[in-house]
Amino acid sequence: MARVAGVDIPGNKRVEIGLTYICGIGPTRSRHALTAAGISFDTRVKDLTDDQLVALRAHIQNSYRIEGDLRREVASDIRRKVEIGCYQGLRHRRGLPVNGQRTRTNARSSKGPRRTVAGKKKAR
């Protein structure tokens, strides 16, 4: 098990997949980082040499905003939008979808479970 950017990456996974355990690194960034570090995509994490791990860690730390920094930046962006009172900030404050999705039906994930209203029945 290797540790990159404060995250334990399972040793039995391919490096390409293992790097996606880090917040802020998806499949595409993973491939870019491996290419820059000169590591094959098919290599298993347990088979990486110390030199390869050092090169990979250095590239990821210097090139990408990941883990705590990324989470902090996203949280501050949301906080700023809420404070200035823009439309997206209002949607965040109310716990509704932010990016223009419909809410007449669906949006249950953000709205939470249904609250039944007493005395409201469907007209026939």
From Swiss-Prot:
GO biological process, one term: translation
SUPFAM superfamilies assigned to the protein according to its UniProt record, in alphabetical order: S13-like H2TH domain (SSF46946)
Entry-linked Pfam families: Ribosomal_S13
UniProt biased composition (Basic residues): 111-124
Gene3D superfamilies for the chain: 1.10.8.50, 30s ribosomal protein s13, domain 2
Biased composition (Polar residues): 100-109
Record keywords, A-Z: Ribonucleoprotein, Ribosomal protein, RNA-binding, rRNA-binding, tRNA-binding
A GO term for molecular function: rRNA binding
Similarity comment text for this entry: Belongs to the universal ribosomal protein uS13 family.
Physiological role: Located at the top of the head of the 30S subunit, it contacts several helices of the 16S rRNA. In the 70S ribosome it contacts the 23S rRNA (bridge B1a) and protein L5 of the 50S subunit (bridge B1b), connecting the 2 subunits; these bridges are implicated in subunit movement. Contacts the tRNAs in the A and P-sites.
Subunit structure of this chain's protein: Part of the 30S ribosomal subunit. Forms a loose heterodimer with protein S19. Forms two bridges to the 50S subunit in the 70S ribosome.
Name recorded for this polypeptide: Small ribosomal subunit protein uS13
Organism: Tropheryma whipplei (strain Twist) (Whipple's bacillus)
Gene behind this protein: rpsM
